[in-house]
A protein has these predicted regions:
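Expand to "…catalyze enediolate/carbanion chemistry for C-C bond making/breaking, isomerization
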Residues: 1-291
């Protein structure tokens, strides 16, 4: 599942959904949560089912359900699982136990609907308050987990602060949680996906945040407008010279499988360099062969 560009749209906004489905997004997230008013939850759920029922293979369809502590959570799952979304996005995920509950509910509904157990993947939008940062051990929780997603806006609301300074950089508590999520994703061996840039009319701000995300090790970025997709995709696609370096590192270690340290173009490389090279080649494979 390619996760460089994930585009949110309200499930009940027909025009926005149509535009999203025609976009170059890797995945379209049909939102049943924040962008849908309480009075419109049932209608949005029905709209999501309609989209899923008529889905083609491109882009992948993900449904952001409502949080587990709401009355809409189970009805959302009951409605969408029979129509086989590529993944379910769990918002406000505050602990591994939340993923275990979702995994249990998905398996029960898959079996009830004659679907293979484990068919539907999970994306977790992690909202970590100061009290729950110590609980970010997501490794081994469920094989459905495909990525951890960072949500700066939800977290800032929990803290009662602004997520960003005037210059666009993240405020200290948000930056700390972002770093913790990167570590948690690495431990769980899943990609980390960065928070959306909130202003589609500010391409300079978007570019600055994308550059930081790439530098810090995120694998993709959430988007809230189609015009954010191209710059995000371009930034997360490894440049040709980086790909050539990765291919050379990989080839050198394949030729010398018992070596721990080698020399490439006069520079020492070791096993951590091989891991980095493999990540780069995996990103290239996802770009050229979307699974």
């Amino acid at each position: 599942m390619k996760l460089q560009t994930l585009l949110f749209c309200p499930a009940d906004a027909e025009r926005k959904v149509s535009r999203a489905l025609d976009s170059a997004a890797d995945a379209v997230i049909l939102d049943l949560e924040d962008s849908v008013a309480a009075s419109a939850k049932a209608a949005a759920r029905s709209a999501a089912v309609h989209v899923l029922a008529g889905a083609t293979t491109r882009p992948d369809l993900v449904v952001r359900i409502n949080p587990q502590d709401t009355c809409w959570y189970l009805p959302d799952l009951v409605a969408v699982v029979p129509h086989k979304p590529r993944a379910v996005l769990l918002p406000k995920c505050t602990s591994p136990d939340a993923l275990r509950r979702l995994d249990h509910h998905l398996e029960a509904l898959e079996v009830a609907n004659g679907l293979p157990a484990g068919m539907i993947a999970i994306l977790a939008l992690v909202t970590e308050t100061a009290a729950s940062l110590r609980c970010m051990a997501y490794d081994g929780v469920t094989p459905r987990l495909r990525a951890l997603l960072f949500g700066a806006e939800d977290l800032a609301a929990d803290f009662g602060i602004s997520p960003r300074h005037v210059d666009g950089t993240l405020t200290a508590p948000i930056a700390a949680a972002r770093a913790a999520l990167l570590v948690a994703a690495a431990q769980a061996q899943v990609p980390a996906i960065d928070t959306p840039w909130p202003d589609p009319r500010d391409p300079a701000g978007l570019q600055a945040e994308i550059a930081a995300a790439v530098r810090d090790g995120f694998a993709g970025k959430l988007c809230i407008h189609p015009n954010q997709l191209a710059p995000v995709a371009a930034a997360f696609t490894p440049p040709p010279e980086r790909v050539r370096w990765a291919e050379a590192v990989h080839r050198l270690f394949m030729d010398h499988p018992t070596s721990g340290v080698l020399v490439l173009n006069g520079k020492m490389i070791d096993r951590p360099h091989l891991k980095l090279a493999e990540r780069i080649l995996e990103a290239v494979a996802c770009t050229s062969d979307e699974v």
